[in-house]
Amino acid sequence: MQIYKVGGAVRDRLLGRPVTDIDWVVVGASSDEMLARGYRPVGADFPVFLHPQSGEEYALARTERKSGRGYGGFTFHASPEVTLEEDLTRRDLTINAMAEDEQGRVIDPYGGQADLEARLLRHVSPAFAEDPLRVLRVARFAARYAGLGFRVAAETLALMRQLAESGELQALTPERSWKEISRALMEPNPEVFIQVLHDCGALAELIPEVEALFGVPQPAAHHPEIDTGVHVLSVLQQCARHRQPLSVRWACLLHDLGKGLTSEADWPRHIAHETRGVPLIDAVNQRFRVPRDCQELARLVGEYHTHAHRALELRPNTLLELLQSFDVYRRPQRFEEFVAASEMDARGRLGLEQRDYPQAAYLLGAAQAARAVSVKPLVEKGLKGAELGEALKCARLAALKAYKEERGKA
């Protein structure tokens, strides 16, 4: 029985990065032997055990064979006869197919160290093309390590393109797809994730609404980058730079979907793209069963982001309607995230990344002014029901008028 550290822990140590999770593979052992040593079984599909002291995962060396469509279409075989090299060959990338023995020696049968040096994300074997989830995983690794100079090897990108064309991506479950997408959006360079999917044809299969934005022009006066797809990539880059949460990053990815519906005759203008994009945002949210907070923010940002850009020009009653659309009195954080997404949109323009966005402070101040209105004096007057609601609305409108006038003097 031999135990090896495998995968990400070996890769990250060699890259000089912090090692957080450690995976282990056990060669030459059976399930009965693991149980006899006090390991606790947890694997439903193949033999994985928890160490009795550390709680870390130890998996028996195994091989896998394609037996059906999709991520789950594999038959696994684990036995004491399976070698370390056989176990490593089923892994996705060479940089993830290295092991380390108990003396700290690296076992690298597929050239992972050379690819680390060359900054290449390269598949281990042609079996890579049997698992559609690997398209998303490789794009996610590209987003994680882009800052270190990593790129996807040309031959691996070709296999990813083959997978995209095969229709296998449609076999991915919404949950698995969302897990990879959400993790990728939180990487240091989420725009690289979308770019890689675009380059290999997978974006057209998974989120055709975003793919449709590439090649669609915008007015150069407002968008020096012109291409809407390029703009979305730049907005995601700003999200990472400003450490925005997942909900903001997801909303920014989808905020301009309506521009993909504009007829070429109307280019580069995109009249009413905000409202036209809402059904597309809803469709993408439903496709991946996106968490409710991300769904709601994406929908609201898509519909109202141009309101944010024009915030300083909005009349008090329009401003009040905007605040009420976000239920800012009970859910202030959602409005704050909307403002953040709108600012990322404004900054995601070529050459304008550092431009001030005074609309952010103005909108947050307006929300504070409206929320500061107390209902108590109105209740004490004996108002209730619809009458109370109307009086509260009038009081908030008055507060916003005063706020706008005060800001106008500043």
Curated annotation (Swiss-Prot):
Q: Which Pfam families match?
A: HD, PolyA_pol, PolyA_pol_RNAbd
Q: Note the PROSITE patterns from the entry.
A: HD
Q: Might you name a Gene Ontology BP term for this protein?
A: tRNA 3'-terminal CCA addition
Q: How is the cofactor bound?
A: Magnesium is required for nucleotidyltransferase activity.
* Keywords for this protein: ATP-binding, Hydrolase, Magnesium, Metal-binding, Multifunctional enzyme, Nickel, Nucleotide-binding, Nucleotidyltransferase, RNA repair, RNA-binding, Transferase, tRNA processing
Per its UniProt entry, which superkingdom is the organism in?
Answer: Bacteria
Key word Methyltransferase present: no
Q: Where is the HD domain?
A: 228-329
Q: Which NCBIfam families does the protein's record reference?
A: PRK10885.1 (NF008137)
Indicate what this protein is called per its UniProt record.
Answer: Multifunctional CCA protein
The taxonomic lineage of its organism, from the top, reads: Bacteria, Pseudomonadati, Pseudomonadota, Gammaproteobacteria, Pseudomonadales
Q: Which gene encodes it?
A: cca
